[in-house]
């Protein structure tokens, strides 16, 4: 069985089309399909729409409700924990990634050709500024952090049950799930696709969320900011020593007049800003260390329901007050 995990946040307008496309994919899949919807504290009517539709849906499904919004990667982890299939796959509810990719994921995993299958973007129907920011970020991320990362970046993947178990063994929070999968190793396969335009609703992936995601992706997987700060500090100190000696020698020989307070203030301002930057970088690492040391769960499941095919209602429902990835 293939378990398909779909995090849901502000997707009520996309759900009717999502149901139709999933039914089409299920008809073409050479295996049983289970859909795990994870409502990540969505403030709209997504939970109600899902519960009503799944009660009479011809596909096997689970509906997991988190106690609040924990973020898409925490929601994915919650769905992976609840999934019962031999193989897993993850897509977004906005349908910008074509659900047909699930068929390719399943084919590769079923054949045993790989343990993890990534779908990577070869193009995207997004505004130019969004494309530019995304391409710039992934280019730098590939250069300095995860060198195996495809140029277009990755949002969706499929994996075996063994990989899922190893992912859930990791207790990191505020992290990048895709980078964790690369860190784990295992055999990988890559399938290209063209990212589609969003047809309904507005993306909840705001600039602020993207910025936070970028910081988590960097600080959790590289010490590059610390090393850059060290190089800046060494270079700045060396420059200050050389400049100071040059001015001192020139002043003592009468070739350089005393210039007043302006150069001193500029140097103080420069190194003061550098110090503040360094404290911010170190503080970010300390904050991430504190978050992980607290050992809080990455998510909390408020309720979980199971819907069997052609059922008049849900077969079982259960609630959990503590669940973590």
Q: Model features per residue range: what roles?
A:
Residues 9-13, 96, 100, 168, ...:
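Residues in soluble alpha-helical coiled-coils and helical-bundle/repeat scaffolds
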Residues 52, 143, 166, 220, ...:
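Transmembrane helix-loop junction
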Residues 1-126, 318:
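Structured catalytic core of nucleotide-sugar glycosyltransferases
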Residues 64-68, 72-82, 99-180, 196-215:
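Acceptor/aglycone-binding surface of glycosyltransferases and processive sugar-polymer synthases
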Residues 176-325:
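Hydrophobic helical membrane-anchoring modules
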């Amino acid at each position: 069985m293939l378990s398909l995990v779909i995090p849901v946040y502000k997707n009520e307008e996309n759900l009717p089309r999502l149901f139709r496309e999933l039914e089409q994919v299920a008809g073409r899949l050479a295996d049983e399909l289970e859909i795990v919807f994870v409502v990540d504290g969505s403030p709209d009517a997504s939970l109600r729409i899902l519960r009503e539709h799944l009660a009479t849906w011809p596909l096997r499904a689970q509906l997991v409700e988190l106690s609040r919004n924990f973020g898409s990667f925490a929601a994915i982890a919650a769905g992976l924990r609840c999934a019962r299939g031999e193989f897993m796959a993850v897509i977004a509810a906005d349908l910008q990634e074509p659900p047909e990719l699930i068929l390719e994921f399943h084919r590769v995993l079923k054949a045993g050709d790989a343990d993890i299958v990534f779908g990577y973007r070869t193009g995207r129907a997004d505004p130019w500024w969004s494309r530019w920011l995304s391409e710039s970020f992934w280019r730098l991320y590939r250069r300095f952090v995860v060198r195996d990362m495809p140029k277009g970046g990755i949002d969706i993947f499929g994996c075996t049950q063994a990989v899922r178990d190893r992912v859930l063994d990791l207790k990191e929070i505020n992290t990048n799930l895709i980078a964790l999968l690369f860190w784990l190793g295992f055999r990988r396969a890559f399938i290209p696709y063209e990212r589609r335009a969003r047809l309904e609703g507005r993306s909840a992936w705001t600039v602020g969320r993207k910025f936070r995601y970028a910081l988590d992706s960097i600080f959790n997987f590289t010490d590059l900011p610390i090393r850059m700060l060290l190089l800046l500090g060494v270079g700045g100190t060396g420059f200050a020593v050389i400049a100071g000696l040059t001015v001192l020698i020139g002043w003592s020989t009468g070739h350089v007049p005393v210039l007043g307070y302006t150069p001193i203030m500029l140097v103080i301002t420069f190194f003061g800003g550098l110090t503040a930057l360094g404290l911010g970088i170190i503080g970010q690492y300390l904050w991430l260390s504190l978050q992980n040391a607290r050992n809080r769960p990455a998510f909390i499941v408020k309720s979980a329901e199971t819907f069997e095919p052609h059922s008049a209602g849900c077969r079982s429902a259960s609630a959990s007050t503590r669940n973590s990835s």
